[in-house]
């Protein structure tokens, strides 16, 4: 049996591979058509102009669904391993909410481009990266709470390093983007897709985009740490019938006679 066939380990694997493919395909399309600069564009800029925005939106919507599934499975796994630990239960529920909000933000970023609906796009980015960072932080705390009884210390340390990586990237992106978009460099900078080294704010722009890509990579790394955990869990859907028919009320008896849809004489 292959490693991705064990339990539900294919979920985080598929999430990372699919999302990375969405970024790569839209990036290649955007630079081939000269819609963005090849050196560190914003991730969402590679999905701003047609046709790549269609690919970007469709693939990230699927990525959001995979992310919801991954976050839910993680929630169920932690709950099953710690059914009576109140502190862990509260943190686990908080992590579920934060993760789902991050998935919602990912879908908003994918479908509302900054050149069309800037406010909605920024709201989606805040949900994706902000709630996503908090989700990683909560899951790292849970990993600390569950070691060494549930898993080894290595998992906690790896996730802690990834959270620190994410935090440094988030701080850099937030600081530089705040300076870049405070109005000092012009109002049209929001719609700007092409940058030259001579442009005002170029350095801040490059730091912001580099931090955004770095933050995304930290997300990928964090979800990859779920692979080993998910090899040890499976979920199943069980159908429970609340009656033997689909009538709202009991049907009237017809003396074992059946009404034909078409007359036999036809």
From Swiss-Prot:
Name of protein: DNA damage-regulated autophagy modulator protein 2
Described function: Plays a role in the initiation of autophagy. In the retina, might be involved in the process of photoreceptor cells renewal and recycling to preserve visual function. Induces apoptotic cell death when coexpressed with DRAM1.
Q: Which organism is it from?
A: Bos taurus
Give the family from UniProt: Belongs to the DRAM/TMEM150 family.
Gene Ontology CC terms, in alphabetical order: apical plasma membrane; lysosomal membrane; lysosome; photoreceptor inner segment
Q: Which InterPro entries match?
A: DRAM/TMEM150_Autophagy_Mod, Frag1/DRAM/Sfk1
One Gene Ontology term from the biological process aspect of the record: autophagy
Is Flavoprotein set as a keyword in this record? Answer: no
Presence of keyword Transmembrane: yes
Q: Where are the transmembrane segments?
A: 8-28, 53-73, 92-112, 117-137, 160-180, 207-227
Give the chief site where it resides: membrane
What's the protein's topology in the membrane? Answer: Multi-pass membrane protein
Q: State the compartments where it is located.
A: Lysosome membrane; Photoreceptor inner segment; Apical cell membrane
As recorded in Swiss-Prot or TrEMBL, the protein's gene is named DRAM2
Q: Which UniProt keywords apply?
A: Apoptosis, Autophagy, Cell membrane, Lysosome, Membrane, Transmembrane, Transmembrane helix
